[in-house]
Amino acid sequence: MEKLDGLSLDLEKQNIYKLKELFPIAVEEGKINFDLLRAMLGDEVDDSKEKYQFTWKGKTKSIKLAQTPSAATLRPCKDKSKDWDSTDNLYIEGDNLEVLKQLQKTYYGKIKIIYIDPPYNTGEDFIYNDSFSDSLKNYKELTSQASSSNPESSGRFHTEWLNMIYPRLILAKSLLTSDGIIFISINDCEVENLKKLGNEVFGEKNFVGQWNWLKSKTPPNLSKKIKKNIEYVLCWQRGGNTNSFRGIQKTSKSDDPITKPQNSIKRLCFKPNTLKFKIEKGIYNKGIYGTEKFPNKLLNDLEIENFTNKNEVYFENRFIWTQEKLDSEIANGTDVKVSRQLVISYKKANYMPEVPPNLIDESVNVDTTENAGRDLKNILKGNLFDYPKPVSLIQYLLNFDIGKNDIVLDFFSGSATTAHAVMKLNVEDGGNRKFIMVQLPELCNEKKEAYKAGYKNICEIGEERIRLAGEQIKHQWQDEHPGEEFDTDIGFKVFELDSTNIIPWDNTAQYNESNLFDLSEVFKEDRTKEDILYEIMLKYGIFDKKVEQIDVNGKTMFRIGRRYMVVCLEDNVNSEDVKAIGELGPRVVVFKEDGFINDNAKINATYNLEKCGVEDIKCI
C-alpha cells in the first residue's frame, strides 16, 4: 500500500513536464537539454548580452520561493464559520504565499477573477518579509507582531516590495482559468514597477489596461505640489479571453436620431404599427418633409390611426440602419418615433453595456473611500478599518466579465470587501458565485478602535464583516420579496494555515531524547480527525468537495464526493470493514497506516479493494 505524498503541487516539475510534452526531442535521460531546446526555438532565443530586462536583488530567489512545494496544511475552524455544511465560500487565515501553494492542486486553472489590494509600500503598511528557508516558520513570527514597516531609508524600499509580490503573482497566475482576469489596486508608489512585473508574469500582450479610480473628493494636503485623489487598478488576462468587458448599462433620457448627414441615402420600409406618432389620427401625402437641413422623403401616402401607422410606409433618407437592423431593433422593443414634421428618431428598450471607460467614479456608480468607510462603519458599528475599498468598486470590476457560477479569489482580503461584493452580486442577479478570501491574521494596533472593540486581528474584522453583511443583504432581500425563500449563499468556511498534521511529513520538527517516542506516532497529538481529513483532501486536490460523515460497521469514516473517496482514520480495521468500504464503490480509499488490526488485514486490504474496482489505495 503506497503512502500519500505530503507536499503541495510542485510547479517546477509541472513546468518541466509541459516542456517535455512540447519538445520531447529536447529531453535526454529525463532532463532538459537546453542546447537542443535553443536550437529548436531558432530565432526566438535572445542570446545577446545587452537586452532590456526588469531585475532587482532577490528576483531569482523569489522565483525559487514560488516553486518550492509546501508541507503545510489548512485546518478547519468550524466555530468561526457560518453555515459550514452548506456553504461553498472559503475564508483562510494565513500567509498568502503558503496558502496559494496549498490551493494549487484543487484550484489550478479554476479561478475566473482575482482581485487584490496589496500593501502599497508607503513605508508603514508592510508586514510581508518572506523567508527563503522556512516561510511557514516566518509566518508564525509575523502573526505575533502588530506591524512591520519598509522605510525608504532602508535602501531596499522597492526591492523588498517586489520580492514580496513577485512569487505571489506567479502562484496566482496558475490558478486562473484560461480566460481568467486579475485586477490589482495600487497607488503611484509602485504602479510603474507593478506594470513591469505584471507584464513579465502574465505577458505584455495580456495587459488589458489601467483604470483610474477617484479615491477621494477631499484628499489630504500631504504635498505642496499636488493633491492625490486617484488610485489605480491594473488588469491582466490569462491569455484566452476574447470577451468585451461590460461597463454600465446605458439608459437614454432622450431620443436618438436615426439619420446622419454623412451617411448614404437608403430606403427603409416601416411595417404597419411600427411607428409612434404624437397625433392620434391623420394622413400625410407622399412628399418631402422633415427640415430644410435634414429633409425626409415620404415615398407613399401615410395614414395614422391610434398614434401609429395604419399602413406600410416607405421613407428615403440618410439612415444609420439597414432594413435588417431596423427590423431587429423593432423586434427587440426599440421605439421608432415620428414628429409632426416627420422627423424620425428612436429610443431603445435596452442598451448593450458600454465598454468601461478608464475613469472610475460616480459617473459609473462607484463610490469613494469616504463612502466605503461610512458603509463599513454602519455594518461593524465603529471605525474599525482604515481606507476600505467600496463594495461598488469591486462589484463594478467583477461585472466586467464574470459568469454566474465563477470563483473569485482575493488573497489580500483586508476587511473582506470582495466577499461582500460577491454576495451582493449574487443576490442581485441570482448567481451562485463562490469567493475565497485569504488574509494574514495581522494583530490590531492596541491604540486603534478595532482593538478596543475586541478584535485581536484583521481576520476577525473580515469574518465579522462577512457575517453581518450577509445578514444585511438577506434581510433587505426578504423585505423586498415577502413570502419567498432566500437561497443565496452567505456562509463561509474558515480554515487556518498551520504545519502539517502528519508527523513524518513535518520537516520543521526538532527531535531529541525527550520526544523521540513521538516518531512512533503518525498524527500530532493536538490534531483532530477532521484536521487530517482536510489535509488529505488538499493533497488530492479535492478541497472543494462536499464531505459526509458515515458509519461503516460501527466505525466513523468520511465520504468525499458521491463516490470519489472514502477516508478511514479508525483503529483495528479488519477484513469486514474493508469489504464494507469496497461495497460503497469509491475510486480512492485512504487509511491510517497503523490503523489495521494486523499486518494480514493491511496486506489483504489492497487486494480486496482492487477486486471491488477501487483505483487508488493509500495510507498515511
PLM region spans:
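DnaQ-like (DEDDh/DEDDy) 3′-5′ exonuclease domain used for proofreading
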Residues: 1-115, 120-167, 591-598, 612-615
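Conserved helicase/translocase motor-coupling segment
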Residues: 539-558
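Phosphate/ATP-binding catalytic cores across multiple sugar-kinase/actin-like superfamilies
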Residues: 96-99, 103-106, 164-169, 175, ...
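Signature of N6-adenine DNA methyltransferases within the class I
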Residues: 165, 178-179, 188-247, 251
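Conserved class I S-adenosyl-L-methionine
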Residues: 405-414
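Cysteine-dependent PTP/DSP-like catalytic domain, specifically the C-terminal lobe
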Residues: 145-160, 209-221, 396-405, 424-503
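SAM-dependent methyltransferase catalytic-core segment centered on the flexible catalytic loop
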Residues: 108-181, 189, 230, 247-299, ...
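Active-site-adjacent helix-turn-beta-strand microarchitecture at beta-sheet edges
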Residues: 216-220, 226-229, 239-377
